[in-house]
């Protein structure tokens, strides 16, 4: 979903949305609980119709007022479903196909877990398993489940994240993510940093937003061996990525554009993506939207191109109940000119609490 810049005082980061239920509020300590059930009934090409979990969650937020604008905060988010990997093997035991089965309610697990401090008018500093400010970059994705081209370091299990308060519509921040394995002999896969700036301004019915981010992280790359060995060997390489986006809105109409590019050191070719989204709010409850994505990846002479078009309609039965219908048509064309189609249609329900 699209990330929106919200004009809030930073001390309110520890507080929750309007959907939250406050279960404790005494002596400067506040605890809120909220969440949402997100289900999609969908049909993809070459698959049967399926009912899947689209990120259902329950979150617990706590804050304690330390005085003089300073507060301590903590956040935990639970999810309920995890995909299960499946391998199809031939009679010789060789893997011929791999895919994931989308489960529903099969695995309760902690998705986010972090704590930190907020200082009113300055910003928040948090430590733990969390989204980084890189996840906030992107303005063109108005869909519920079919698009998005964010290529930045957007989350980390062991992350330190800073996000400033809003200054005249401008917000900035950065994050550092540690590698999963601290052993000096282990690969540094996932370790990196991200910086980003966000600007949002509204004058009457006209709104403008601009966002940009840059990140570097280590990624695991297989080492080519000659002759090929039975045991695969991997090494660290750096992936550098940037993303910029802009949005122009007037009353209920909004047009967003994002561009993303990434490159892995010592690997030929870059990955480039352009996304254009259009959203129109018919009224306070209903909206229609469309989204276009163009992607290109690979070295010269071996480039793969992807094209995706998505359209949808969303309707709020209640301020906390959303329904939608969405469809997308994807085309992937390899360097030999072979085209693979990937179409999907779905209808969904989100109940917030």
Swiss-Prot record:
Entry keyword annotation includes Hydrolase:
no
Alphabetized, the UniProt keywords read: Cell outer membrane, Disulfide bond, Ion transport, Membrane, Porin, Signal, Transmembrane, Transmembrane beta strand, Transport
Q: Where is this protein chiefly located?
A: membrane
One family from Pfam that matches here is Porin_4
State the GO CC annotations: cell outer membrane; pore complex
Q: How does it sit in the membrane?
A: Multi-pass membrane protein
Give compartment(s): Cell outer membrane
Which interval of the chain is the signal sequence? Answer: 1-20
Read off the Gene3D superfamilies from this record. Porin
Q: Whom does it interact with, and what assembly results?
A: Disulfide bond interactions within and between MOMP molecules and other components form high molecular-weight oligomers.
Role this protein plays: Structural rigidity of the outer membrane of elementary bodies and porin forming, permitting diffusion of solutes through the intracellular reticulate body membrane.
- Name recorded for this polypeptide: Major outer membrane protein
Q: Which organism is it from?
A: Pasteurella multocida
